[in-house]
Amino acid sequence: MLRTLLRRRLFSYPTKYYFMVLVLSLITFSVLRIHQKPEFVSVRHLELAGENPSSDINCTKVLQGDVNEIQKVKLEILTVKFKKRPRWTPDDYINMTSDCSSFIKRRKYIVEPLSKEEAEFPIAYSIVVHHKIEMLDRLLRAIYMPQNFYCIHVDTKSEDSYLAAVMGIASCFSNVFVASRLESVVYASWSRVQADLNCMKDLYAMSANWKYLINLCGMDFPIKTNLEIVRKLKLLMGENNLETERMPSHKEERWKKRYEVVNGKLTNTGTVKMLPPLETPLFSGSAYFVVSREYVGYVLQNEKIQKLMEWAQDTYSPDEYLWATIQRIPEVPGSLPASHKYDLSDMQAVARFVKWQYFEGDVSKGAPYPPCDGVHVRSVCIFGAGDLNWMLRKHHLFANKFDVDVDLFAIQCLDEHLRHKALETLKH
């Protein structure tokens, strides 16, 4: 009797109704939980502010261009305490990456896409490095997203411990790897191009999903978030973007004469070279590019491009004309016409912001950018904290050069700013 009564009560209309509401509520809650951002993608866990607790530098003021705070940075860098601060060595990274879970958590890498838009637009990176493991870690962390792909080329002249440290970092991520073939990179020689080509081949074979390739060196740093980079790349609509201008006459000596590496340095042999095997004239540019996957495939497979590259191997600084020239060959995917009307300067292209000493000056009087706040090496500015405010208002994706040994706070403040900006998207 009691069992029959309970059965009638349980399966009566009101009870069945409330039971169904409960089940549907639980299902809805579960679905919402699945599509929520994981718990670790929280602002508190991934924010980088306060990573250097021993310093009282206010990065917000630095980024605003506050003269007093920037002067404070300069004084801090000169202190004995700062100069004797603990530094991470390759051996430290080898030890840290022996426990990948701990390393990723400690270094606050982002291991989930921050948006659907970013997840659906993977980017490939070629990173050429030879020293300063902490710089590589900071760069990789700043650009790392699980949907992207990262090839790291390590100079064969690098110390064994450095290579081991890079391999340790790469081992902690399924989408980060060391190039399958490594070169001994000599300044201004073909080996710099070959390093990027090696990564191009590996990345092209690794995945057909990535949309664009961006090449970097170990002293680059982003000045845009991953989402901002994705949106700028989408606006290109398949076109490549890199510096490509008419070849100035003073640079013609670089490819009209034959060069070879002698005792680790590139030397002019004085031998006159044959003209390039190309109808398109040679164009001047830089080592840095933002190119589509279709461009990469064409470069790797096209016979005409292969002949051009073979011809260029004994020239001076081929990276500063090769990519710029390929970008003006008509049949290359995403290329520009050879007419000078389509020339792009380094300030018009988005690939890289670089300050050259001989162009610095008063912007109000026609200079392209203000004086360097850091130091100069080979006429290139190694940025200081005072360079950030102006730089962040430019359209470029990356800037070169940064160095933890010149101005750590320039990198730290930029790093904090980009991470906070990226995490802000989670609130909307």
From Swiss-Prot:
Any one Gene Ontology MF annotation carried by this entry is: beta-1,3-galactosyl-O-glycosyl-glycoprotein beta-1,6-N-acetylglucosaminyltransferase activity
Q: Which residues are glycosylated?
A: N58, N95
**Residues reported in the UniProt entry to bind a glycoprotein:** E243, K251, R254, E320, K341, Y358
Q: Provide the protein name.
A: Beta-1,3-galactosyl-O-glycosyl-glycoprotein beta-1,6-N-acetylglucosaminyltransferase
Query: Where mainly found?
Result: Golgi
- In residue numbers, the region (Catalytic) covers 122-428
Q: Which GO terms describe its cellular component?
A: extracellular space; Golgi cisterna; Golgi membrane; membrane; trans-Golgi network
What PANTHER family does this protein's entry cite? BETA-1,3-GALACTOSYL-O-GLYCOSYL-GLYCOPROTEIN BETA-1,6-N-ACETYLGLUCOSAMINYLTRANSFERASE, GLYCOSYLTRANSFERASE 14 FAMILY MEMBER
**Under which main EC class is this enzyme filed?**
transferase
Bilayer disposition of the protein = Single-pass type II membrane protein
Q: Which cysteines are joined by disulfide bonds?
A: C59-C413, C100-C172, C151-C199, C372-C381
* Tissue expression per record: Highly expressed in activated T-lymphocytes and myeloid cells.
Subunit details: Interacts with GOLPH3; may control GCNT1 retention in the Golgi.
Q: Which residues lie on this side of the membrane: Lumenal?
A: 33-428
Please state the gene responsible for encoding this protein: GCNT1
Q: In which pathway does it act?
A: Protein modification; protein glycosylation; Glycolipid biosynthesis
Where is it located? Golgi apparatus membrane
Write out the GO biological process terms: cell adhesion molecule production; core 2 O-glycan biosynthetic process; glycoprotein biosynthetic process; kidney morphogenesis; leukocyte tethering or rolling; O-glycan processing; positive regulation of leukocyte tethering or rolling; response to insulin
Q: Which residues face the membrane's Cytoplasmic side?
A: 1-9
The ranges of region (Stem region) come to 33-121
